[in-house]
C-alpha cells in the first residue's frame, strides 16, 4: 500500500528474537553472499547488528534488533527490562570512558575490548534473568521485551504482549511478502504517530556516506546486486 516506499523511516529495521538471531548467524557462517556484522557504537551506545552482503563495496544493510521472549507479567517485564537498559548504559559508560571504544566509536566484535563489553552485557543479563523469566518457547511466551543492547527509544513503545506479535502475518511489499506482527499499525502509531508522513528530519539522516554513492566501484556493486 506504500508503493514500495517506507515513509516513516529511511532505513530498514527488523526485530528478531534472540534465538532466531543465533540461528541466522549459524546459517550464514559459511555463506558466500551474506553475513551478520556486529559493531559496538559508543555514541548511542548500542550493539549494532546488521545483515549485510560480504561484498565490502556494497554499503546496503538491514539493522537487526534482538527481542527476548518472556513468560509471566509482560508489562512488569517490560518495565524491569527498560530499567535494565538504563543500568547497562550507565555501567558501560563508567567502565569504558577513556578507552579505545570512546576513541574509536565504532568497535568491531573481533576487538579484545569488544569481548570485555560482551562480558558486561552477559553480567547484566544474568542479573536480569533473576527478575524476569526468559524462554525460547514461543508457544508458552506471554510477551516480548527489547534487548538491553538495543538503541534507546525516543519514547516507550511497549509493552509487547505476545498476541500482538505472534503469529506473524504476511504483508505484500513490491513483489514479495514479508512477515509482520498482526498489531503492526498500533506500534507504528506508538512510535511515529502519523507514519504515512515523511519524517521532518529525514534530510539529517545519512546511514550511508554520500561519497560512497559517487564511487564507481560501489555503483557497480549495487547494480550487480540489483540485477542478480
Regions inferred by a protein language model and the residue ranges of each:
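Short, well-structured secondary-structure segments
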Residues: 1, 196-199
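Active-site nucleotide-donor binding segment shared across nucleotidyl transfer reactions
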Residues: 1-12, 16
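A short, surface-exposed interaction/processing loop segment used at functional sites
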Residues: 88-96
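Conserved SAM-binding loop
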Residues: 24
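Helix N-cap motif at beta-to-alpha junctions
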Residues: 18-21
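Conserved catalytic core of two-metal-ion nucleotidyltransferases
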Residues: 28-82, 98-191, 198-228
